[in-house]
């Protein structure tokens, strides 16, 4: 049976990692073979030879109020940041009509953990009920990001551990290819939290030195960050002058 599948193109990207917080600097860091895996001051308090690719630079979102930022966990804040960067690159951030039709799919693994870390780490005085209310749910980042970015085309959460982000991209692709949406924002976001690091450490799967692609090392290096891409139906992108 003949099917009329739509063509799908990528029109915007955003990135946040231990190497950079924008696409151009990230690309240059990769070309220069920079290594973002370092000794972790955060986890060295708990574990020996603690190494990770951590996001250490400050996240700059001047368009958000301090009150809003305080209510978001890193999973939501990072997802918002890379999502907005992708919309800016796509030329859609100031297009209300386009945002009204755009859906959001977010891939996560341990979202909702941060608000309760003070309880895990015996820092009861740092526990915030407001943050727990806004960011304590597993899918809280979806509602936060869609609201802050003005996306009204529906939201979905993918929680399939290490495959969450590519699954989010695949689902967004399917929505467009099958004519269910003309544009989608796919986001992956994952901070490293103490329970996650402790779990991999207890399994003895982390290598004491930095891993690299095809290095053949008998272990892994854990990292954190976020990424986003805007996917559009080809004719939709051409009609609005996307490049």
Which residues does each PLM region occupy?
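Catalytic metal-binding/acid-base residues of hydrolase active sites
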Residues: 190
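Short conserved active-site loop signatures built around small residues
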Residues: 165
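Active-site histidine-anchored catalytic micro-motif
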Residues: 168
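Conserved "HGTGT" condensation-loop signature of ketosynthase/thiolase-family condensing enzymes
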Residues: 1-153, 177, 193, 201-221, ...
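Internal active-site segments that recognize and position negatively charged phosphoryl groups
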Residues: 171
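Short, high-confidence coil segments that cap the C-terminus of an alpha-helix
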Residues: 181-182
């Amino acid at each position: 049976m003949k099917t009329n599948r739509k063509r799908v193109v990528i029109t915007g990207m955003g990135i946040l990692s231990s190497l950079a917080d924008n696409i151009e600097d990230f690309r240059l860091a990769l070309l220069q073979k920079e290594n973002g895996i370092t000794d972790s001051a955060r986890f060295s308090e708990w574990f020996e030879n603690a190494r990770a690719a951590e996001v250490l630079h400050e996240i700059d979102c001047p368009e958000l109020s301090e009150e809003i930022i305080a209510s978001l966990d890193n999973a939501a804040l990072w997802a918002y940041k890379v999502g907005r960067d992708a919309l800016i690159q796509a030329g859609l951030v100031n297009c209300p009509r386009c945002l009204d039709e755009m859906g959001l799919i977010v891939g996560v693994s341990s979202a909702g953990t941060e608000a309760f870390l003070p309880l895990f780490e015996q820092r009861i005085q740092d526990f915030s009920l407001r943050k727990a209310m806004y960011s304590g749910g597993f899918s809280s980042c979806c509602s936060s990001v869609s609201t802050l970015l003005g996306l009204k085309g529906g939201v979905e959460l993918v929680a399939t551990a290490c495959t969450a982000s590519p699954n989010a991209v695949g689902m967004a692709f399917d929505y467009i290819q099958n004519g269910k949406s003309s544009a989608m924002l796919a986001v992956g976001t994952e901070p490293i939290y103490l329970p996650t690091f402790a779990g991999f450490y207890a399994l003895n799967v982390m290598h004491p030195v930095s891993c690299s692609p095809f290095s053949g090392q008998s272990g892994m290096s854990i990292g954190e960050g976020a990424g986003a891409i805007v996917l559009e139906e080809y004719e939709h992108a051409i009609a609005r002058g996307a490049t």
